[in-house]
Amino acid sequence: MSARAPSLPRPRAVPRSGKQLVAFWQVPKILVYLLGFIPAAWWFELGLADRLGADPMKALEHALGLWALRFLIASLAITPLRQLTGINLIRYRRALGLLTFYYVVLHLLTYLVLDQGLDLSAILADILKRLYITIGMAGFVILVPLAITSNNLAIRRLGAQAWHRLHRWVYLVAILAVLHFLLSVKVPIEPLFYGAVVALLLGYRLARSLLRDRGGKVPAKARN
């Protein structure tokens, strides 16, 4: 009697509206965090080497803020990417969101400590007089509770529905981030590009919500 080769378990398909979610190589989440901090380390290294140009503080602030916006957009793109292409990177959304917060904190600390030297009167005057700083601070205040509740314990305590309602404020944070960027530069080409991306993501979200409210067919697993 011939020996049979042991059969390997078949990968389980996850159907979704006639399509299967694409199984991507599973990168450990910790690696996402480590890779995410490389830009910050690089820019601080440039600063220590005195290679940030004539205004190093502004260059560092700009770079950290820009990376915060990039990570924010990446986190917002996770759900549309899954719904439109089947590419499922949902397990990395929290990491991208927290990286957004970490970069915003670094951006803010660079302004408060390195740029303003913790001069509270100068900082308060900036917040009151410069609209882009007022908008940036407002975005940070909204972002703080989102970062604090980016964990499973918060989901259990708040309940899934309340937690999702709270985290929809991230879209307002994205709008404020783009406005902050737009008003802080003289040449608006770069912030307009990122603003267009945010507008597309927000428009997609609103379109799906309207479709669902009107009784359109929206896959259950896409309602995130």
Each PLM stretch: what is its role?
Residues 2-224:
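Membrane-embedded alpha-helical bundles that constitute the cytochrome b-like, heme-associated redox core
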